[in-house]
Amino acid sequence: MTKKYVALIFGGNSSEHDVSKRSAQNFYDAILATGKYRITVFAIAQNGYVLDPERSKRILALEDERPIVADYMTTVDQQDPLSRINALRAAGDFDIFFPVVHGNLGEDGTLQGLFKLLNKPYVGAPLRGHAVSFDKVLTKELLTVNNIRNTKYIVVDEKTAKTLTWAQVVKDLGDVVFVKAANQGSSVGVSRAKTADEFEAALTDSFQYDYKVLIEAAVKGPRELEVGVIGNEDPIVSEIGAHHVPNQGDGDAWYDYNNKFVDNSSVQFEIPANLPDAVTAEVKDMALKAYKVLDLRGEARMDFLLDENNVPYLGEPNTLPGFTNMSLFKRLWDYSDIDNVELVDKLIDYGFAEFEKNAQLSYEFVSLGEEKIGKFN
């Protein structure tokens, strides 16, 4: 049997560029370990250019990226906008894309739009699922209208933020809030505020990353939970994992970018999470419901906050969860009796299945006729 040809694409121009490389290394190894696929790699440099497979392999091996990218840029016509993706021609006729681009481009639907334009199967959620889930405000609104419990919130832009007072925030949401850029991942552009000065500083920081900012009520004494979901029409959930960041003396600690990807030595992990059976069932049910409501496919991680009364709140989905050695998503499936090799095989199968299903849809062209649209001269 001819092996399917997988194009693993990683990197990107977001703050999660280096995280993507570490995730891609694990996916690359797992794909090879299946023995079922040929594989090539494409790195997206921080300037947004897709690099050829030879240079991309060197970047995946963690060589210094700067001279590799500088050398590649001497080979392209930078006046041609299509030169940004021209390297995709180098791999020949591969069968499926496997995106491992966290943050911008990879999780906001941009790459998925390109894959659809190229008429190629790809692993993961469709464009609309990524785009909606990456926008924290749209996600909250969809969760709310579908009665999926989440925290209270306020949305502001730069104009409305000028008239919003800290007193009003405290009245509506409480005296501790989280301020988040609407379209960012991995806790980038996220701050906790418990005073007026901290709130103003948090807004300033978040507006560096987006024109729309979400202000969320904090959950008191929370336990942070994560659950993995994979599949298409009939998704399955992993065991639930919990993590706890010890208090540093300034209030409730939280799972920030540094804890996730730089140094998690102080983080206490618990897999599976020690929860009452009813809470376990509710969290898994909420995760599955959100997965379907947000039109997700392939894979996702659902993040929850559990308050001091064991009431779960869905925080946000992650449509392309990290797969580094520090990532809880990766470990959740190990504890769910699905190892890395089986997991990537399933994800690739889901990608092909979704493509084949969508290929059955009708996109009928109906001509208006020359008398309606005229002739081109």
Curated annotation (Swiss-Prot):
Could you tell me which InterPro entries the record lists for this protein? ATP-grasp, ATP_grasp_subdomain_1, D-Ala_lig_Van_CS, D_ala_D_ala, Dala_Dala_lig_C, Dala_Dala_lig_N, PreATP-grasp_dom_sf
Identify which cofactors the protein needs according to its UniProt entry.
Answer: Mg(2+); Mn(2+)
Query: Which reaction is recorded as catalysed by this protein?
Result: 2 D-alanine + ATP = D-alanyl-D-alanine + ADP + phosphate + H(+)
Give the residues the record marks as binding Mg(2+) 2: 316, 318
Q: Where in the cell is it found?
A: Cytoplasm
Its GO biological process annotations read: cell wall organization; peptidoglycan biosynthetic process; regulation of cell shape
What EC class does the entry list?
Answer: ligase
Q: What is this protein called?
A: D-alanine--D-alanine ligase
Residue stretches making up the ATP-grasp domain: 140-349
The residues that hold ATP are 170-225
Where is Mg(2+) 1 annotated to bind? 303, 316
Query: SUPFAM superfamilies from the entry?
Result: Glutathione synthetase ATP-binding domain-like, PreATP-grasp domain
The record's listing under Gene3D superfamilies reads: 3.40.50.20, ATP-grasp fold, A domain, ATP-grasp fold, B domain
Show the PANTHER family listed in the entry. Answer: D-ALANINE--D-ALANINE LIGASE, D-ALANINE--D-ALANINE LIGASE A
Co-factor binding comment: Binds 2 magnesium or manganese ions per subunit.
